[in-house]
């Protein structure tokens, strides 16, 4: 039985990967009177007087909504709200299993930006945080920014920021292995969608000076055509030399490649044209931009992918459960850039210097320390 066949079989058996589990047991009339009417009126009255009391008396204190419109699901594309449900259920499982955070999958049957924003605002009172998931660019940027302005709970688009945080953590350690530094390293980010933009922003915030973005049309610069509004903002702070050309041109003399794009688009010759001991994060799934063995043969020193069957898996699960755990426990109203940087550094710090090597730059997803270390990094900045 293939993994695909097994996944389909297990999903049929599960009939959904999550369920409601009652914390209060109703075994008598007294239990019923306390859990529901008339006793339930007391916490209701307290919350009506003081909305903050919802964190004390309801699930709000440890529950997030996982919200998607199904417009950009994994490698499947725009499959719609209903077909996105298995992914959102899976995300809810990861929140609980890795961070102890309750999560509710909510798939909205609209891809209208205003309707999504209004829907999330209207359900927000029940949740301590909002995790946006698999919403296509550039709408995802506006939706997240608007919701952050409208809500007093954390709003986090994991496809953007979870990816960026783990990439930065990996790069921090990869630079230790290779002896490179952020001041002089030349970085190429291929893919100018949600993940590529967020990765570029976080690398710049961390202190990288020379970052160039590429997409299917090649190097992005101020003269590029058909850029969306976010890409137009990004070309103002990247590609400072205003280089033009293809991805191959961008990679000549580069130190670091980050791919969130398409399979098999980086060749051996491209890697060979990069600086000595190049770092490549080829994260297209399931087939990366270049296979690790090919990249290594061409001279790359450190190679990471999104896959669990290769070393250095760049996996968001080492970030988002702990981030929300910390944000909820600390009652954060937002997840800031400082928190993202601190989280990346905390994740990188989980691999001691003496254990760092080209095949070990990131902690394993199942490392039991991860969520607590990440949550502490977040809480220290609240």
Predicted regions and their residues:
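Solvent-exposed alpha-helices and their adjacent loops that cap or buttress functional pockets
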Residues: 55-60, 96-97, 122-124, 148-149, ...
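Short, ordered loop/turn segments at secondary-structure junctions
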Residues: 69-71, 79, 108-109, 134-137, ...
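Glycine-rich phosphate/diphosphate-binding loop of Rossmann-like nucleotide-binding domains
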Residues: 74, 81-99, 157, 165-262
């Amino acid at each position: 039985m293939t993994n695909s066949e097994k996944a389909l079989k297990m999903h049929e058996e599960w009939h959904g990967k999550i369920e409601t589990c009652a914390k209060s047991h109703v075994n008598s009339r007294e239990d019923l009177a306390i859990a529901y009417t008339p006793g339930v009126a007391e916490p209701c009255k307290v919350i009506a007087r003081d909305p903050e009391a919802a964190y004390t008396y309801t699930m709000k204190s440890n529950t997030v909504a996982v919200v998607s419109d199904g417009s950009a699901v994994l490698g499947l594309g725009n499959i719609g709200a209903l077909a996105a449900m298995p992914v959102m259920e899976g995300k809810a499982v990861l929140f609980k299993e890795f961070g102890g955070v309750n999560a509710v999958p909510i798939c909205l049957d609209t891809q209208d930006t205003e309707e999504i924003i209004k829907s999330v605002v209207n359900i927000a009172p029940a949740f301590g945080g909002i995790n946006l998931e698999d919403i296509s660019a550039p709408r995802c940027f506006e939706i997240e920014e608007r919701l952050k302005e409208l809500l007093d709970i954390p709003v986090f688009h994991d496809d953007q920021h979870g990816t960026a945080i783990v990439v930065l953590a990996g790069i921090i350690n990869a630079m230790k292995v290779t002896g490179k530094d952020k001041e002089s390293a030349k970085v190429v980010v291929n893919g100018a969608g949600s993940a590529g933009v967020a990765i570029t922003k976080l690398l710049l915030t961390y202190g990288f000076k020379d970052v160039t973005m590429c997409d299917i049309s090649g190097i992005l610069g101020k003269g590029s055509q058909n850029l969306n509004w976010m890409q137009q903002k990004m070309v103002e702070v990247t590609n400072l030399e205003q280089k033009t050309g293809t991805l191959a041109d961008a990679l000549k003399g580069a130190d670091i490649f980050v791919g969130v794009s398409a399979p098999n688009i980086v060749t051996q010759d491209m890697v060979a044209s990069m600086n000595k001991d190049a770092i490549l994060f080829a994260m297209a799934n399931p087939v990366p931009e270049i296979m690790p063995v090919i990249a290594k043969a061409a001279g790359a020193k450190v190679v990471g992918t999104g896959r669990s069957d290769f070393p250095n898996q760049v996996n968001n699960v080492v970030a988002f459960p702990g981030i929300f755990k910390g944000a909820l426990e600390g009652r954060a109203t937002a997840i800031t850039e400082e928190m993202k940087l601190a989280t990346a550094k905390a994740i990188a710090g989980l691999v001691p210097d003496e254990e760092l090597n080209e095949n070990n730059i990131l902690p394993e997803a199942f490392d039991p320390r991860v969520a607590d270390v990440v949550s502490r990094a977040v809480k220290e900045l609240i």
